[in-house]
Each structure stands twice: as C-alpha cells, then as structure tokens.
Amino acid sequence: VTNVTIAISPDWTIDLNIPGITVLEWDFKTPPPADHIDIAVAPHVTTPDLVERVAETGAKLLQLGSIGYDGIPRDLPEGLAVANAASVHETATAELAMASLLYAARDLDRAREAQVEARWEGYYSAGLADSTIILVGIGGVGSAIAQRLAPFETNVIRVARRGREDMYGTVYSFTDLPELLPTADAVVVAVPLTESTENMVDDRFLSAMKDNAILVNVARGKVAVTDALVAHADRLRLALDVTDPEPLPNDHPLFEKATLITPHIGGNTQAMYRRMNRLVRKQVGNFISGEPFVNVVLGR
C-alpha cells in the first residue's frame, strides 16, 4: 500500500508526516471527510453508532482511544477491525490508582482541610506499609499497579477471573473474593467491564470489607453498584475515578460521602498523547507494509 487516508478525531494530535499519507480531521458526528478512509482514529469516548459511520467509509481499522471497548457492537461489518489503545493508558491509570490509594491511606483529605482552615494539626494514618491490598484485575492496568505497589512493602493479593499460578505467585479467582475481602486494608479494582464484572462491587462485596478499608475503582463505573457505594460510604473510604452515571449529577451523595472523586481521568497525562502517537504510527506502518494491525480486539 502506497497511499493511505486516515481520519483522526480532533481529540488527538498525531504526527504523521509520512509520504503517501493523507490526514483528515473528523469529529465522527458529521459526514466523513472523504468517500474512502483506510484508518479511523476515534475520539476519547466512543458510541455504538460510530462503528456504522466508520464502516460506511470502507475503513479497515477503527483505532479506539481507550483500553476498554465495552461500548462497541460485537457484530462488526465484514472487513473492519477494532483495536484498543493498549500501551497508551496503563501507566497513567496505575499512577492515579497509586495516588488515590496513598491519598486515602495517608488521610490527605484531612490534611487539606486543615490547610484550608490554616490549622497545624498533626495526626496518624494507616499508611500502606505492612497492609494487605487486594488487586482485582491483573491485565495491563492491574499489572502496572502491582509493579508500583512492590516498593511499598505491602502484601498484595492478586485476583482475576481465573485462578492460577504464574511467575509472581498465586492468582486467586473471583470466586475466592468472599473469603479474601475481610482480610483487606484496601481493594483496588482494575477489571474490564464484561458480563462477569458488571455490578461486581455490590452490597455483598462491600459488606465483606472491614470498616475503614479503602476501595479504589479505576475500572469502569458499572463494575460497581452505585447505591451500594452510597450505602457503605460512611464506613469505607472510597476513591473513585469512575462512576455510574458519568458525569455524576452535581447533587449526588457520593460527592460528599466519598473520600476522593476524580472525573475519569485515569489515562489523562501528557504521556497519553505521546503513546497514542506511537501507536497510530505503528498501525499506519503495518498497514503500508502489509503487516497485521496490533491490539485488535474485535473483527478480522
């Protein structure tokens, strides 16, 4: 392939100064900027109708801007592949998970409140050292979190859909959670949204956690049952980057009850743009050379 047309959402700034490449901007809401497009780079947030719009252009690849692809229909038009943004967001999301965990474990909300009121007030907090942390989900994001937890001298219990042994030790299964949760000082949720994980963090899950334990959610909002979070927010410390719904209504009780709410910004760092740039250039290069696309999660 010598001539490639790529349509890119204005959410991204991609450097594609490559001979034979035509780069067009497309908001994916208006008609496509060309009759034929080879590769479409989606905005941060995708909707099911976006796939149909892209398919009408004869595109070979829809490159998502997210790791998750739960909003994409599984019955794709023939010839269209969907790739996620694995390698783009894992590090940044793990950073936010660690920041949220430390914020809650060191009671930094308390320190901030004292600062605003100009009070010098010392206190002790739980901290992370010697604590037990359950990590639910050990995919790209979960593994990145596990790597960052290692220097903090914690006991990390890893949990995934399927229990197994790997090079790092035991991975417990979701079915082990009822026995594991009461032991945890903190639980970090980093699973994809699937049929088996939707509403996983429900009343039963939260009831099994001990008082003052920390729950960090950097997965998807629908992994947790919102009413259950509200019900347990007075005895648990909730640090949520994702919620259901998003955005939360401004009068939602979680704003007051949660220890920390961040507006789904797990991947939002400058590194995201550099890494997305590298990924798109890789996809274009593979298309030109006839190599398979990388990160394909749906389609051919």
Regions found by a protein language model. Name each.
Residues 50-58, 74-78, 205-211, 231-234, ...:
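Short, conserved loop/helix-junction motifs that constitute active-site signature segments
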Residues 162-253:
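Rossmann-like adenosine-cofactor binding region
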Residues 212-214, 218-300:
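Rossmann-like dinucleotide-binding domain for NAD(H)/NADP(H)
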